[in-house]
């Protein structure tokens, strides 16, 4: 199993939305509309691998929420140090680049992982109402390792 890298994210179509440090936005805060989008948010540190292709440190997913807090709620959990991962991110004084990837673009990282372009074209998409973000999160854990997350 390999570590997920920035190349994997770029190949899937992820976009950079900003940088955090200690659970706070560093160098500017993205608009709330961006932070409330459902999908996956990946944290990348330059310390997580070679500078040309750093490894992904952690991943978080956000579903449709009535409160529309989105990734802001994840940052709140980090600031409150509600898990070992949150305590590490809050205390290690490392800046993390935040990449966003909507669920509609997850195929190359989940069911299509490791397949060539032709096979990927015939691999099913995640359009089932029963295909949850939690299931996609588990597929990511099956296909990749993350620097700060064991699963």
Curated annotation (Swiss-Prot):
InterPro entries xref list: Phage_Ndd (IPR009514)
Annotated coiled-coil segments of the chain: none
Keywords: DNA-binding, Host-virus interaction, Inhibition of host DNA replication by virus, Modulation of host cell cycle by virus
Family annotation (Pfam families): Phage_T4_Ndd
GO biological process, one term: symbiont-mediated perturbation of host cell cycle progression
Domain of life: Viruses
Gene Ontology molecular function: DNA binding
Summary of the function given for this chain in its UniProt record: Disorganizes the host nucleoid and inhibits replication, but without host DNA cleavage or degradation. Only the architecture of the nucleoid is affected. May act on the host chromosomal sequences that determine the structure of the nucleoid. Binds to dsDNA but not to ssDNA.
Protein name: Nucleoid disruption protein
């Amino acid at each position: 199993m390999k570590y997920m890298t920035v190349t994997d994210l770029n190949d899937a179509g992820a976009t950079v939305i900003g940088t955090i440090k200690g659970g706070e936005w560093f160098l500017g805060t993205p608009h709330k509309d961006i932070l409330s989008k459902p999908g996956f948010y990946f944290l990348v540190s330059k310390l997580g691998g070679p500078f040309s292709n750093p490894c992904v440190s952690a991943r978080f997913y956000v579903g449709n929420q009535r409160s529309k807090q989105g990734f802001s709620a994840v940052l709140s959990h980090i600031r409150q140090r509600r898990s070992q991962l949150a305590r590490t991110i809050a205390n290690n004084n490392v800046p993390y680049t935040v990449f966003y990837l909507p669920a509609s673009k997850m195929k190359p990282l989940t069911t299509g992982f490791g397949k060539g372009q032709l096979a990927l074209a015939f691999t099913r998409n995640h359009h089932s109402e029963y295909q949850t973000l939690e299931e996609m999160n588990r597929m990511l854990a099956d296909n990749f390792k993350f620097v700060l997350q064991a699963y």
